[in-house]
Every structure is written in C-alpha cells, then in structure tokens.
Amino acid sequence: MSRTVFCHYQQSDAEGLDFVPYPGELGQRIFAHIGKTAWQAWLAHQTMLINENRLSPRDPKHRAFLETELQKFLFERNADKPDGYVAPLGEE
C-alpha cells in the first residue's frame, strides 16, 4: 500500500517515497514532504548537474554543492542550471 504526501515541490497530493532517500534530517524532510515524481525529477536534474559540471560524488565540495542544489530544487524551486544550459522547446 502506498503512502500519500502533500508534495512541497508539486504543491499537491502525490504518492510518497517508499524509503528515506537521503541521510539525516534532510532525508527525513524529503521522505515526509516530497513525492516520487518530484524525486525522479531531482534525480534527472542531479544527473545533468553532475555531467555538465563534471562533478565527482567522491569530492566533498561537489557533494556539498549537490546537497545545496537538492534543497533549492525540491523546496525553493530555484536550483541552478549549468552554464550555457538551453531548455528544450516546451520547457521553462
């Protein structure tokens, strides 16, 4: 049976995550307030950031950057785009 949460990202009820996706207090906040669709959107955005900025998940500075972007993306709706990013037609 799936959980329903009020997704902060989508501003509507959504299917909740099956598990805490990130360690610590931030992970608990994500689990309680973010739906599966929003989490998948973050994973795609994170992949773009890693690829375009040539980030290494092993580098503590890069991990800190990604955590900041995670919070901005899911809870503030103003995450950075890579330099020179051009959205495909039909996207914001």
Curated annotation (Swiss-Prot):
GO terms for molecular function: iron ion binding. InterPro entries: Fe_traffick_prot_YggX, Fe_traffick_prot_YggX_sf. GO terms for cellular component: cytosol. SUPFAM superfamilies: YggX-like. The keyword Magnesium does not apply. Keywords: Iron. One of its GO terms (biological process) is cellular response to oxidative stress. HAMAP family: Fe_traffic_YggX. Could be a mediator in iron transactions between iron acquisition and iron-requiring processes, such as synthesis and/or repair of Fe-S clusters in biosynthetic enzymes. Belongs to the Fe(2+)-trafficking protein family. This is Probable Fe(2+)-trafficking protein.
